[in-house]
Amino acid sequence: MDKDFIISFAKLMSISGYEYCCEKEVDALVEGIFDESFKDSLGTRFFIKKCGRENAPKILVDAHLDEIGMVVTDIKENGFLTVTNIGGVDTRILQASDVIIYGKEKIFGVVGSTPPHLQSAEDTKKLKKIDELLIDTGYSKEALEKIVRIGTPVGFDDHYVELADGRIAGKSFDNKACAACAVDAIKNTPREELAGDVILMLSAREETGMLGNGASVGAYRIDPDYALIIDVNLGRTPDTPKTETVELGKGVSLTYCPVTSKKLTRMTAELADKNEIKWQISVSGRGTGTNTPDINLTREGIPCVDVGLPLKSMHTCSELLDLNDAQAASDLIRAFICSKEIAEVFAR
């Protein structure tokens, strides 16, 4: 899997509710791959690649495009900004972080941090709330107000680092790395090999799902025969529980839980084995923390398989993935959209 393609997606500014800001860039990244494209009023993008056969099954591949971020709540004296979070920002890592403020022009800022020399013993035990933090821009208030206003989105700085053994770290791999994997899979699949018409849904507002999820609206509009949802899954580290995480470098995860189709998941696992694609099991007694529950409950119910890309340090500015897992994700999506066996079972 091409790391530069993944990073090109991850660099896009698509904070929940502001997905429209990257429409032109997304169009450029998928140019020449799809037959049709359109969007809805929530900001979800749809891209269709047809198999060329009449009355073909509709296969939905969902990868949410939005990312966590912040939004300006006030402009203070001496060029400081206050913000609140959009989605589940990990406030533990915010102090001293580099950020980008997407105003009339893109400007940079740093989240302020009190030096340890000036902190009391009690201060060191406290975690500041996000609305207590200040972003330093270096501008005067007067100059800043010409560029930024209340309601301006703020995101993590878009720097990326390459680690050993094919691992990379940076912002917004949740979930734009998965979007890149889905595009890569569809791009590399000749239409005559498709088991049906494939609809890629780059859904909006997953990170703020309690406020209304773009996936449920989009799935209702498309009304697919069955669906594959790809999102990141919690990567295992020495300090995290084995039962709630998956390993990097061991391939994608397939989630068994009440809202996934057991038959579709089993057939997808068999497909992975047949194509020698690495995969691992993820189990939940509830939902998935992805778009799967929303899509599953759409209309009369849509059979879903939940595919996970292992990711460490989720919801931070340094999310970490393994490119081999990304390749496995792309390979499995390609095998899935080409599976005549799955189409025969789940086509309505």
How does the language model describe each region?
Residues 1-348:
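N-terminal hydrophobic/helix-forming segments and targeting peptides
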